[in-house]
A protein has these predicted regions:
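Catalytic cores of alpha/beta
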Residues: 48-49, 53-63, 103-117, 149-154, ...
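Charged helix-capping and loop-helix junction motifs
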Residues: 1-3, 50-56, 82-86, 133-141
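C-terminal helical cap(s) of enzyme catalytic domains, especially alpha/beta-barrels
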Residues: 31, 133, 139-144, 181-196
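Hydrophobic, well-structured mid-protein blocks that either form specific transmembrane helices
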Residues: 57, 61-106
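Glycine-rich phosphate-binding active-site loops on the catalytic face of alpha/beta enzymes
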Residues: 11, 40-44, 64-78, 118-131, ...
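Histidine/lysine/aspartate-rich catalytic loop segments that bind and position anionic ligands
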Residues: 97, 103-135
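Structural preference for beta-strand elements that scaffold enzyme active sites
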Residues: 16, 35-37, 67-70, 97-99, ...
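Conserved N-terminal beta1-alpha1 strand-loop-helix module at the mouth
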Residues: 1-59, 63, 98, 106-114, ...
Length: 196
């Protein structure tokens, strides 16, 4: 089904796909010729990090042709006490781009300094110490765009076309990832049902 979802996204104007799991990435990349940001979500008992948390997930992603590998780059403890810098190095040694999923400005700066090729605000509001917003954190995005030299991708809580327009026009982001607003039919249906 994810291959069909990706084909529909491409038909609608998407210029890339963010996908979770080796099987979904492979299916999508057989179906569409768009760049793919690959992740694997996996829980570990010794850490709150679950987006591409360890070397194991990166090695799994490297079996796919995805061009970009995204991982949690927050200040939290990684499983097995692994170091983010080592994971970035592993990604680069394989000739792929590394994308940092961050929750604060300081994490975005640290990710850039660590050698990440791209930073994103994916985890803003999802760590205990980051600000929760109903929509995208426009001020955080603008500050990152204005001060960092790596591309900034807006991700997280882009719920409307107006949100997307604002992250480009006001914040000046390089690109944006729209997730649940497109990929979860139950949430789309709920938005309509809730007005009745």
């Amino acid at each position: 089904i994810m291959g069909r979802m990706a084909a529909a996204a491409k038909e609608g104007g998407a210029s890339g796909i963010r996908a979770q799991s080796v099987s979904q990435i492979n299916e999508i990349m057989k179906t569409v010729d768009l760049p793919v940001i690959g992740i694997i979500k996996r829980d570990y008992p010794d850490s709150d990090i679950y987006i591409t948390p360890t070397r194991k997930e990166i090695e799994e992603l490297l079996t796919t042709p995805c061009q970009i590998i995204a991982l949690d780059a927050t200040n939290r403890k990684r499983p097995n006490d692994e170091k983010c810098e080592d994971l970035v190095k592993l990604i680069h040694e394989a000739g792929r781009l590394a994308m940092a999923d961050c929750s604060t400005y300081e994490e975005c700066v640290a990710a850039q300094d660590m050698g990440f090729d791209i930073v994103s605000t994916t985890l803003c509001g999802y760590t205990p110490y980051s600000e929760m917003h109903e929509g995208p954190n426009f001020e955080l995005l603008k500050k990152c765009v204005d001060t960092l030299h790596v591309p900034v991708i807006a991700e997280g809580k882009i719920n409307t076309p107006q949100d997307l327009k604002q992250v480009y026009e006001y914040c000046g982001v390089f690109s944006a990832v729209v997730g649940s607003a497109i990929t979860r039919p139950q949430l789309i249906t709920k938005c309509f049902a809730d007005v009745l």
